[in-house]
Design a protein with these regions (language model features):
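Glycine-rich FAD pyrophosphate-binding loop
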Residues: 32-52
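Predominantly flavin-linked oxidoreductase catalytic cores and closely associated redox partners
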Residues: 121-278
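Beta1/beta-strand and adjacent pyrophosphate-binding region of the FAD-binding site
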Residues: 6-23
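Conserved Rossmann-like nucleotide-cofactor binding loop
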Residues: 23, 46, 177
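C-terminal helical "tail/cap" subdomain of flavin- and related membrane-associated enzymes
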Residues: 340-432
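A conserved beta-strand/loop capping segment in the N-terminal third of enzymes
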Residues: 61, 66-116
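FAD/FMN-dependent oxidoreductases across multiple families
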Residues: 76, 135, 252-338, 344-347
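Conserved N-terminal glycine-rich FAD pyrophosphate-binding loop of Rossmann-like flavoproteins
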Residues: 45-65
Length: 432
């Protein structure tokens, strides 16, 4: 816990973390580990469901290992060997690359279980969790405009009551809704990509698949004489518990974005999959649900006036592959390190330390996300996507390079030629 000398009598914690998803729980864990008094506020109660593909690349697994989470299969994880890519009449299995910086396996776990695992980990290290607490806006100092706390409601039904909490630093981990940022007038950038994903679970014999599977082409073959290419991309991730997570995503660079029924689109694709996979309504375990994917730093600045934006609240989903969990967790680690350094200084010296957070994000992801924006614009053109699928998939070496690029899996030093090319491109690209 934090020392009393750093916390003023009127303050409820040294750091308030709003949202107990991967970003919030990761930040709370590292902050508590650093000896700070952390208040973690979550609008729901655990366990709770989140719309997600549930699949982690080695980048995500690394964050779990760094956090101290047991990632063995005996601990409830289903490991995978790599990515299976399907498109253009080709099916290609690509093993995760062997790297110094990342493990050589991915993992799958339902978000309902995953998020609770992370938040309990944070609690064990000393973070104080308040569930059923919906934070709606920031409290600002009338003189300086600095964020000094948050306000909202706690409880349900007739027990609901207004609440407010105060701390010298607040971490906004409140997801795509970004209520705290919006309460300060921080809107999203329209020049950044946005995606939408929908998914459903099915009881299926494919539950123990040892690869994450990505479909680059989604076909509606209900009329065999006139097959139609549907917009978007699909995934099939075995969960290891008898079920499979099946979903699709679509980017706002597609002409179909916002103009189609995404749930119907998913059904159109799945009705053309083999019967034995059981991707039919009678085998569903829950209804189709969807969520937005804020990409490429679509909300900035990531630090201002005592408020840090983490994960989806700061638009940190990878534009290349729609992956959000690793970047949410990494932003939690960055934010916690900067916050710990800042809060051990005198108040008049903290701002300089806190300004290191957005700089660290830009250095780590800025050039990569700029390349991602270019990639998203290109694949939004169906003809470009068709050509990439037709001529790219049969070339294994090219696809190995593509896997490293899309999953952001390279060694920064002493990597192979592919690593050097990717790292060089990200350094040359202007920061997002």
């Amino acid at each position: 816990m934090g020392t009393p000398s750093r916390r003023k009598p009127a303050e409820d914690a040294e750091v308030i973390v709003v949202g107990a998803g991967p970003a919030g729980s990761t930040a709370a864990t590292y902050l508590a580990r650093a000896g700070l008094d952390v208040l973690l506020l979550e609008k729901t109660t655990f366990p709770r469901e989140k719309v997600c593909g549930d699949g982690l690349t080695p980048r995500g697994v690394k964050q779990l290992i760094d956090l101290g989470v047991d990632t063995r299969e005996e601990a409830g994880w289903l490991h995978n060997k790599g990515l299976r890519v399907v498109g253009g009449g080709v099916t290609l299995e690509l093993a995760w690359p062997t790297l110094a910086n990342f493990p050589d396996f991915g993992a799958v776990r339902p978000r309902q279980d995953f998020d609770e695992l992370l938040v309990r980990h944070a609690e064990k290290l000393g973070a104080r969790l308040h569930e059923d607490t919906t934070i709606t806006e920031a409290i600002t100092d009338g003189r300086t405009g600095r964020v000094v706390g948050v306000t909202g409601t706690a409880g349900k039904g007739k027990d609901k009551r207004p609440v407010s909490y105060r701390a010298p630093l607040t971490l906004a981990c409140d997801g795509v809704s970004a209520r705290l940022a919006l309460s300060l007038g921080m809107g999203k950038r329209e020049d950044r990509p946005m995606g939408v994903a929908v998914r459903r679970y099915y009881n299926s014999p494919r539950t123990h698949d040892d690869h994450l599977e990505s479909h680059l082409e989604l076909w509606d073959r209900s009329d065999p004489a006139n097959p139609k290419l549907l917009p978007g991309y699909g995934w099939i991730f075995g969960m290891g518990d008898g079920t499979v997570n099946v979903g699709l995503g679509i980017l706002n660079t597609s002409d179909a974005f916002g103009k189609v029924d995404y749930a119907d689109l998913l059904k159109q694709w799945l009705k053309n999959t083999p019967e034995e996979w059981q991707f039919r309504d009678e085998f569903q375990t829950i209804p189709i649900r969807g969520a937005a994917l804020p990409m490429g730093f679509n909300r900035q600045p990531h630090y201002t006036r005592g408020l840090m934006l983490l994960g989806d609240a700061g638009g940190m989903v990878n534009p290349f592959n729609g992956e959000g969990i690793p970047y949410a967790m990494e932003s939690g680690a960055f934010a916690a390190e900067v916050a710990a350094q800042a809060l051990h200084r005198q108040p008049n010296q903290r701002e300089r330390a806190l300004s290191a957070y957005p700089k660290a994000l830009k250095q780590e992801y800025g050039g990569y996300y700029t390349l991602g924006r270019i990639f998203v614009k290109l694949i939004g053109n169906p003809e470009v996507m068709r050509l990439c699928t037709k001529y790219g998939l049969p070339r294994t070496t090219l696809m190995k390079f593509t896997l490293k690029l899309l999953a952001n899996l390279t060694d920064p030093r002493d990597g192979d030629v592919m690593d050097k090319i990717i790292n060089g491109l990200t350094k040359l690209a202007p920061a997002a």
